Amino acid sequence: ILVGCSQGGRIALDAALLHPSRVRGLVLIAPTVAGAPAAVYPPGIRLLMDRMETIEAAGDPDQINAFKARLFLDGPLSPEGRVQGEIRERFLDMNGIALRAAPAGASRDAVAAFQRLDEIRVPSMVLWGSHDFPHIQERSRQVASMLMRGSGHALAGAAHLPSLEQPEIVSQRILELIARCAG
């Protein structure tokens, strides 16, 4: 059973398509999906994305990290600083390590998964936060409906990383998927 969030969801989908006999179930949290339609941003979010591009071009990892916390932890339409304390510190620490790491390189196993989701026959669950980007919420709903044995669940009050904000709920959902796979 593979569990993946965001880009990890893309990797899990690719693995399920490339190696179906090795995958018994999927839990996808706000997954990126190769081949999915390009995001269309409403004006307010377009401004945030433009700002992110400017910050990334400047190259300051601390500024990039802080703004990514704003987008992915707080949620793009939520007040900045919505999530505080240990959760925010954990995000900044983990994401800071990733930002300072050497580039990982390109995936050699990338698959145009969006057009092939109906080939995935294992029990699958898609989770997303109600404070995540609108296009990610919509894509998550689409993925859940396109997977033959998929279910979809919005997590109220979470953004892009519900496993950080609501670990008990996410863990319970994973256990539900494990039970579906065992049954």
Segments predicted by a language model, with ranges:
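Conserved alpha/beta-hydrolase catalytic His-Asp/Glu region
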Residues: 43, 57-111, 116
